[in-house]
């Protein structure tokens, strides 16, 4: 095939949503010449659904992206209207930060970053085809018949792939927020031999702020204590003048309106055929599935400081517009609310993720990567996490460097990608803390400790950032050593002070670290006995120290499990293995192995339907093959 390339790039990224911007920024910062192509520049890093970043598990992903050298955390720290730490009354493993975003400002701020990034070209164009030669991605062709060469292509098209919006009996071709759908590229991905699925998501109506009666709703303010997503943000820049959200509920009348109109609901008439998200169902789905519930929470979330639009969180729907209006007016506080936008469902094509490697490169086509909702996930944060990994690995591949694979013990990003490529997904995938078996070591407070060194090694963490990280790490290490070296003895004077503070007296000598391990004792209590650290420690380091010490036993057990799994991950499976050549493994295991083609024993062990006996047989088979190869090599010598 002869192509007429008018421009040449190292990497072309298709789609400028949250996955696309992270992929393109990472690759360009690693020295690659990158083209970021988008159908509509005005929608760069746009939030077509909820105007927020973070939340349970998701907030930790944002910090992981930041630790690796990504941009989402920095951008939301510049553009939030409210910041809140969730689950503060629970254990450290499930705490996470959530921000209400000024969605227009967020998009503009990210666009400014992209436009000012060296090596990165932003262009509004529609990509119709990925050009492939000898099993390798070599470029793209646009709708205007321009051909651009590339050594790698990353598809981050979100819900635009053959997107269709559904409102009642109305169904039309569209991407998110009534943008153009990408039809030809969807066809092209099928023609390239990729297996394609069909998913669905939705969004609620938006109402006018000045038409809401806030007096009958419950105010939900942000936090006064400074918190940030990015480890580079400063407490003195924390926004105190925050915009509150408001809580209201559906009621019996709301439910009756929905029940009376189920015959007009696309979810139940067969119009919607795509699989929807389990953890973010439409309101009509909730009313049917949870018929015993008298009410459902709804959060009224402002979409920015300079807009009247308010997002009705929890009211996602594709009901006809007239039904949506009646439904909105049945809700306390929204009796006279003006609906500014109608809720809708959107169906879209996605690439079944079992076809991907852990680098997010497709197994079928070398140099073709996919990330974000294209891979079947939901959420801006999940998209950003995949985007930065795809961008990093595309850059490493064309630079001839070792790939970056995040393990399940490295971060929630690693958990997500492993789930996708090992188990696949039959519905839009959402990250949850319950998906992570090592969640006590994958906390919001230690993402930088886990991943900054990786970001530095690949070139995404600059000298200034690295110097700040080293200072923090040294302060943490030094204080942990100090606490372990100082002894508190059960002498009269010490115990008098211990009892005065309301604690049980000491019966044996203990280190300051052991004393801090007591649930009721805080770091400041310990300092009252041993004095402050040589260098003043900020609250974030103190939080990290307390968590590491108080949960040391559990963390140690988790690390033992990590070491065991690491040994299994180090046992590679040859890419050309003949699964039919292995005797005695169960039929289901053989079928799953053929479908997923696991790269390591560890990955093989996590495939659903594969039992320990199958893994044992596989390991015996591989050991036999290795012995056979060794004997052959010895004979040839």
From Swiss-Prot:
Gene from which the chain derives: mnmG
Location in the cell: Cytoplasm
Cross-referenced InterPro entries: FAD/NAD-bd_sf, GIDA_C_N, MnmG, MnmG-rel, MnmG-rel_CS, MnmG_C, MnmG_C_subdom, MnmG_C_subdom_sf
Protein residues bound to FAD: 15-20, 127, 182, 373
The organism of origin for this protein: Streptococcus pneumoniae serotype 2 (strain D39 / NCTC 7466)
Cofactors demanded by this protein: FAD
Superkingdom to which the source organism belongs: Bacteria
Keyword set, alphabetical order: Cytoplasm, FAD, Flavoprotein, NAD, tRNA processing
Protein name listed in UniProt: tRNA uridine 5-carboxymethylaminomethyl modification enzyme MnmG
Binding site for NAD(+): 276-290
Assembly information from the UniProt record: Homodimer. Heterotetramer of two MnmE and two MnmG subunits.
A GO term for molecular function: flavin adenine dinucleotide binding
